[in-house]
Amino acid sequence: MTVSILVVDDETDVAELFRQRFRREVRQGTYAMHFAASGEQALEKLADGIEPTLIVILSDINMPGMDGLQLLTEIKKRRPELPVMMVTAYGDDERRRLAGEYGAAEFITKPVNFDLLKTQLRDLSDAAD
């Protein structure tokens, strides 16, 4: 089964980094990668539908406009079943606490450990089966 991953980050180089790090898994059909540059754009993509439908969202916290914690709150209102992993360069206790309180599945600090992230994604996918 292919899992769609929606990566939400306002930094354009993040999309390229994720494309590089997940190149093999995308080629093998394990993951389908989707990208949004803002919280608002992520909500539009979710409303329009993302295929395949099993989705994991990876969102930066610090973004202009709707930040990642606001996005997390909106996603949990609209699609509470979707796992959302927060990714941030700021791993302070307050952000970690808020992310957990708002329903984040994971809290990941940058630079991203992609081996660990892939393990966490596999675990989420296995739990959904």
What are these regions (language model features)?
Residues 70, 91-108:
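Alpha4 helix (beta4-alpha4-beta5 surface) of REC/receiver domains from two-component response regulators
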Residues 58-60:
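Active-site T/S-Asp motif of two-component receiver
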Residues 94, 112-122:
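C-terminal output helix
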Residues 12-35:
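Two-component/phosphorelay signaling modules centered on CheY-like receiver
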Residues 63:
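Receiver (REC) domain active-site loop signature in two-component systems and cognate sites
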Residues 19, 35-56, 77:
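Acidic, metal-coordinating helix/loop segments flanking the phosphotransfer/catalytic sites
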Residues 25-26, 47-52, 74-81, 102:
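Conserved phosphotransfer cores of two-component systems
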